[in-house]
């Protein structure tokens, strides 16, 4: 099916272009969401008459997205999740979780604007791409940790995927003298 795009759609085309797409994509996504019109003579004339309005609306959406991008770009957010000693999460951090974290900070981002190839399944620092507008793309950093203190340590560059790194190593507790007396002969004086 041929459609006229009413806005720029990544990997498809610019506003005003006539492109050929699969019928299901047009019927289920582009047409119901008002992102395209069927390519016929009446709709081409309608598009040309509304072109200035559509371009102004698109420019307004882009400027709003750019304002949010200026505030969000490069920012770091802490996500606290329970994880095993190797750093594997009990569960994962998906696009829905990213939206919740951003909403808690006061940013209204849709789940479809978060681009994660796969859910995050390990603690650490992770870059997440946000597509705020077809022409505005930014990255935020998610600091996935077991606790806020651990997140601070991760932000400083510590690797927290081993037991010693998580809980720390107490050198005094590892001395053999604490467990047995090398001077003793192995017989308890009370028993003798």
Curated annotation (Swiss-Prot):
Ribonucleoprotein found in the keyword field:
yes
Q: Which organism is it from?
A: Rhizobium etli (strain CIAT 652)
Q: Which Pfam families match?
A: Ribosomal_L9_C, Ribosomal_L9_N
The name on file for this protein is Large ribosomal subunit protein bL9
The biased composition feature labelled Acidic residues covers 179-192
GO terms (BP aspect) = translation
Ordered alphabetically, the record's keywords are:
Ribonucleoprotein, Ribosomal protein, RNA-binding, rRNA-binding
Q: Which PROSITE patterns match?
A: RIBOSOMAL_L9 (PS00651)
Q: Which family does it belong to?
A: Belongs to the bacterial ribosomal protein bL9 family.
Superkingdom field = Bacteria
Q: Name one GO molecular function term.
A: structural constituent of ribosome
Provide the Gene Ontology terms for cellular component: ribonucleoprotein complex; ribosome
Q: Where is this region: Disordered?
A: 172-192
Record's function text? Binds to the 23S rRNA.
